[in-house]
């Protein structure tokens, strides 16, 4: 099948509490929706995000064919670089976090890269998590996103301290696309290990207090944010609608290692 049916994936049809706790998830429960089939029966199928984004089964022939067909179609219609959205969730194994499961994730990535290369395209895995994952990808010569830059740069501007930002510029991948804001907002999880926890908290508090048009309520469980994983605002808002601060941030981004990507809504 194309999707991951719980009755086939889990030994008892549903995960134990320990297995549920181990899963890297965006909701405070096991990640699934109840799907109704043509014969009126209902089953739990894996769903990491919203109901319109049911996870694909990368282990079955149907899943593999779907992946290949779409990669080839995109490349043949002009895509030279194909983003693999939320790629770290693609491989699942019972008893693991089901997030960036090694070595399986590398096998899937290599399969995607091979298909894309046959059509003259490259792939760009999109992963929000610890910066070490981006470094692992870069070591294998894959393009990556720099999702650590936004919060590091905010911290530097807020507190006039470039120490952590400069350190990141020294160790960050070079084959990367830099961002300040995206449709997901500003990443928080991406700077763990690059900013001390207390500095992350200070930057978040400063953003909520001084950032224009930023509300805490949009970054809570009520709005499907289990943790403050990403802060939903533009970079301009995060800088308090300060034109000079925004231009400074963009200038630093444009001269930082990598290719700058500018989110059009953030302009």
Predicted regions and their residues:
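Active-site and adjacent substrate-binding regions of carbohydrate-active enzymes
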Residues: 1-267
